[in-house]
UniProtKB/Swiss-Prot annotation:
Belongs to the dUTPase family. Keywords: Hydrolase, Magnesium, Metal-binding, Nucleotide metabolism, Virion. It catalyses: dUTP + H2O = dUMP + diphosphate + H(+). It is found in: Virion. GO terms for molecular function: dUTP diphosphatase activity; metal ion binding. Involved in nucleotide metabolism: produces dUMP, the immediate precursor of thymidine nucleotides and decreases the intracellular concentration of dUTP to avoid uracil incorporation into viral DNA. This is Deoxyuridine 5'-triphosphate nucleotidohydrolase. Its main location: virion. Pathway: Pyrimidine metabolism; dUMP biosynthesis; dUMP from dCTP (dUTP route): step 2/2. The keyword Magnesium applies.
Length: 388
């Protein structure tokens, strides 16, 4: 090996040999660690001391996105013990392999069909809309979203008289519902086949704590809540952008979504779905489609944020109050129609959900007294605690 000159701290030039690198040369063929069986009768395994060169490491790191690798965690109710179920195959396990989301149909005004790895739906009956806050309508399907995943309802319809708000579905037994905001001052009917959309399931991703700034810890479903810090007053027909003191650093292959909560979808407020870019403050745009002033109390959960390893895109809709539509990619997780699945037997009925929503809405309307102004104030503040 040739010698080289090195500059020491004492500023004296001395001759020294090039230290031997623990990595291979760039031009050498990359080799992996291999296992070789010993010739001895003990059958011990000896690891061949072979390293991997830097070029191979860089190429492997660029081709493989380590943060998109997700292993489904099994909860206590999802674990399948073969010792307790002898003689049964994997087909009877709580979650099929490869992973597919179990679902079943329910009587409703919608027709649901399985289309590749998504559930496509459209209305088969006329849907009547009024100016009053209507009870959400079931989409006619119940599904079980496993832990570590989330679902999203994406609507393909865009009309000047109404708007269908997307919804994030947490990891549990779910009965997706339709939330429609009437943009007209009169009663109207939505003809069959007008409302159509898809339901997709995607993996959740929880960034490291050092990647998040001023974000509270997520809930058990890996959703982050975004709350207002002060009172917001939005005039009739006005649009206001609400910023939250929260941000996150760039993470390769990660996408963040912000979607409004259902409490606002049932009112005359439209919270535009947003793709949260890294290095920017979280924010949502709120549109007041009513003829009254709306007051949002402090510490009110306006939207929920979720991180995923799939890329979502925007579809601008021009002058429509929705502003933009989120277009999800093709999910990797499919569905399987298993009406007799054990996890679907405990699904709450849509009627029970509607009753609970109505009770919560009645209590939230009495949370605070109206403000004395010339306009009518509709308070959508936090819900009061339930007293026995």
């Amino acid at each position: 090996m040739l010698t080289m000159l090195t500059d020491r701290i004492d500023s004296q030039l001395v001759l020294s040999r090039l230290p031997r690198s623990r990595f291979q040369r760039f031009w050498e063929t990359p080799t992996l660690i291999m296992k070789e069986e010993s010739a001895s009768s003990s059958g011990s395994i000896i690891l061949a001391e072979k390293s991997v060169n830097m070029r191979y490491c860089v190429r492997f790191a660029s081709d493989s996105d380590f943060q998109t690798t997700f292993t489904l965690p099994q909860s206590t109710e999802e674990k399948y013990d073969k010792e307790q179920h002898p003689g049964e195959d994997e087909a009877s396990s709580p979650l099929p392999s490869p992973l597919k989301v179990p679902y079943k149909w329910m009587p409703s005004s919608f027709i649901v069909k399985q289309c590749h790895t998504q559930l496509a739906f459209y209305n088969k009956h006329i849907i009547w809309l009024s100016r009053e806050r209507k009870v959400p309508t079931s989409l006619g399907v119940s599904l079980y979203i496993p832990e570590g995943f989330f679902g999203i309802t994406f609507y393909k319809c865009l009309d000047a008289q109404f708007v269908c708000m997307p919804e994030l579905l947490e990891s549990r037994l779910q009965v997706p519902q339709l939330d429609v905001v009437n943009l007209n001052d009169t009663f109207q009917s939505i003809f069959p086949g007008t409302i159509e959309g898809d339901i997709g399931v995607f993996p959740c991703f929880v960034p490291e704590p050092w990647q998040l700034m001023n974000l509270p810890p997520p809930n058990e479903h890996r959703f982050f809540s975004l709350r207002t810090r002060q009172t917001l007053v939005i005039g009739p027909g006005h649009t206001q952008t609400v910023y939250f003191d929260a941000a996150y650093v760039h993470a390769p292959g990660i996408c963040a979504l912000i979607v409004g909560v259902r409490q606002f979808s049932q009112s005359d407020l439209i919270i535009r779905p947003t793709i949260w870019l890294p290095g920017t403050a979280a924010g949502v745009t709120v549109v007041n489609t009513s003829h009254t002033t709306v007051c949002i109390s402090p510490h009110t959960t306006v939207a929920k944020a979720v991180f995923t390893t799939h890329r979502f895109t925007y579809l601008p809709v021009g002058s429509h109050p929705l502003g933009q539509m989120i277009v999800p990619p093709t999910p990797d997780i499919g569905f399987t129609h298993t009406p007799e699945h054990a996890l679907l037997q405990r699904t709450p009925s849509p009627v029970d959900d509607d009753v609970d929503e109505t009770e919560e809405d009645e209590k939230s309307s009495d949370a605070e007294s109206p403000v004395n102004t010339n306009d009518v104030i509709f308070d959508v503040g936090p819900k009061p605690p339930r007293h026995p």
